[in-house]
Amino acid sequence: MASNGHFSSVGDVDGGNYQHGVQVVDGDKEFNPNLSKYLAHENVTPAGFNYHLISVFGSQSTGKSTLLNTLFKTDFSVMSETERRQTTKGIWLSKNKRTASNEKEKMADNVLVMDVEGTDGRERGEDQDFERKSALFALATSEVLIVNIWEHQVGLYQGANMGLLKTVFEVNLQLFLKDTKSTPRSLLFFVIRDFVGTTPLENLRNTLMQDLQRIWMSLSKPEGTENSTIEDYFDFEFAGLPHKSFQPEKFASEVDKLSTRFRDGHRDPSSTSAKGTAVEGGVFLPEYHRRIPADGFAVYAEGIWDQIVNNKDLDLPTQQELLAQFRCDEIAREVLILFDETIGPFEVQQAEGVRSGIPLILGSLGVAMRAARGKTMTSFETEASRYHKRVFMTKKSELEEKIDTRLKALFSGQLSAAHKSGVTQFSEAVSAAVKAGQKKGASYDFAEIVTRERKLAIEKFENEASTTMVEGAPWSDYKQELSLFQKDLEKISSQLRKDEMRRLATRVERWVRSRLGDSIDLEFNALGSGRGGSRAPENGDKPSEKTIWDRIWSLFVNTVLDAERRFTERARSFDASLEEVDVGLWRLRRKSWGVLRSKIEEEMMEGNILHKLRENFEDKFRYDDVGVPRIWRPTDDIEGIYTTARESTLSLIPLLARFRLNETSAPPPLDKWVGHMPSSASAADEEDLAPIGGVDEDDGKSLEEEMTMLSEAKRQDLTVRFKKAADGVYVEAKRSAIGGITQVPLYFYGLLLALGWNEIIAVLRNPIYFIFLLLIGVGAYVTFRLNLWGPMINMAEAASRQAVEEGKRRLREFLESSDSGRQAMAMSGRNARGTEEYEMSSNLKSKGRRTDTSDDDNDDDL
């Protein structure tokens, strides 16, 4: 197989062929941008730190890819048995595919295997640049470096890849120069191929270790590491595999046994084993891991390769800068872990508060921010200041910027929460104080409440902001936020004042409605009292019907003037401006006219006004000038009295049809009384106001139309209906007068005496009849003298009515107990429903027209 054609190689547009792996770097040193897609495809990206990377080194055509395919069940390209030439070009990566039936044979999760181009190939010749760069890349990313050599190469320099290992050691000193406790270690795993067993594996190990020690001693070590040993940086493992072709079964068995070693391991801190020696269990020790999260590995690897490839002065970056970059980044990550432990919970709480929409002020945030920032920067400076000065300063600035970015976000969020919370609490506190003042029934100073609560809110905001500040941070200033907070408080104060003004206007309007309702009721109830009667006042002059509109207008104006005085006095305590008061008074006058208009329309409803006219007529027809009820006699001028009373009542209809003052015979000056809209009024101030004819030009109604209470059609209909009602009263009076003239003829008494003489003599001669007749006569005389005939007649009528009702009830119960009876009752009910509704409406006229005049007790305390 010539190349890894079934892998996703560098240059693939979609990079979708991920079944077997991906080419990380091609032969021309180009990095594959699809590496992250492959890791996502293999579900490695969400693994965090739960992954492991293995690289394999060795001479070209020594079976490296074959070893990986057999050991990890990968599908790297291998050399054809019929020809010997390069198969692996660049660096390839694949995920371990080996599975196991039990936990003892199972490998670690997410093992990534990197197949590196072989060394000492004829294709590159003496060009060792790629060899050195690939070694640097593998060492910077891998935990375990597998060195694939043949048994007969042990003891050789080039054949045993000692030149490559020297490069690895040099690169390691450049990358991982650290103190002992934090030095990342790597594992060099020597796999000796075609192991026959004649030479014990331990002897081969000793030979290789001696060669490695000599190479290490020959290196030019950085200051401070002159006396270091190779075991300070590397651990070593050795394994031998039989010949694949000559001993295939044993080869497969040893490979299976070898696969069980690639699992997570743990080094016992109390162990006395020498450094550099293998440990029992898995080969993946925590100190081998490069601590790069899986989701950032692709970016990390690309950045490492970019640094390696673009170094034009040396094959590898200079010691100091590369080491400084690595160490500073590592130290920054370490100190940020502690920083996250302190600040992270606050960030989570603040984010949760933002998502919930509830402003959350974090307690002790300022203390935690100051402590975390100071401790983080101090720890970084202590650990990283000994490295390259320029890199250190750059990394310090980056770390400080990163920390300050997060702290600034927390600081801004805290101020934002304090801002929102302060505004909400200010609004609630003012509203609560106002409600408390209303409940007590006493007057309260709204302006004083607002001033007091605003001062408390600003003090609380400044306290929260000052305790959250971080000294020395350029962003730790809250003057602008304080100014915005004060502006918002002013807006809220203005809005609360407007709301309170609206509530005041509503209370005043309700007060006006209550006062006008009672007064207008009295005026309309007094219709007809000019001639006395049931509606006449007990004392004082009787009002004239012609001046009813004058009295109503006077009552209306005086009531509204009193309401304006109350409104103005209360508005002063709100610290309202003159413009706001003018707008409020203008709205009050318009609203009050609407209340009066509505009340008059209620009184002028067809049922109500007809009832009033009938009462007026009956007062004039049934009562004399001094209010004494008339008892009709045949000699009375019933027609004349009826005509006079009817015409007098009919004259009220045109009077009530239009709102006109008797003094001027013209409508009241409503337009002048309401006045023009103040210049400070907004569209919102007039959107809930009903248009008024003669005042609002856009309404299209004149003042005359606004003052029309009854249309011509309603007047005519009302006249007709009233005349019918008056005719009924007249007929009733006429009938009662005619019924009183019936007399018994005189001859009837002579006839009665002649025909009843025998019965009279029989009664007079019989003592029992005579005594009974005498008792009846005495009883009748006494009843007459005591004026008891009326009560006795009433009692008799009541008893008869009760007897009739009882009979009806018994009859109804009887009918309801039979089907035919229920059907008859249903038909009778439908026929009588119209009559009953008319009677009910007639009986409830005066009650149905009443409006709810009950107001809050606070209305009188405006």
Swiss-Prot record:
CDD domains: GBP (cd01851). GTP binds at G58, S59, Q60, S61, T62, G63, K64, S65. GO terms for biological process: endoplasmic reticulum membrane fusion. Its EC number is 3.6.5.-. The keyword Transmembrane helix applies. Residues 476-500 form a coiled coil. Its main location: endoplasmic reticulum. The chain crosses the membrane at residues 744-764, 768-788. Residues 818-862 are annotated as: Disordered. Residues 1-743, 789-862 are cytoplasmic. It is a multi-pass membrane protein. HAMAP family: Sey1. Cooperates with the reticulon proteins and tubule-shaping DP1 family proteins to generate and maintain the structure of the tubular endoplasmic reticulum network. Has GTPase activity, which is required for its function in ER organization. Belongs to the TRAFAC class dynamin-like GTPase superfamily. GB1/RHD3 GTPase family. RHD3 subfamily. This is Protein SEY1. It comes from Arthroderma otae (strain ATCC MYA-4605 / CBS 113480). The gene is SEY1.
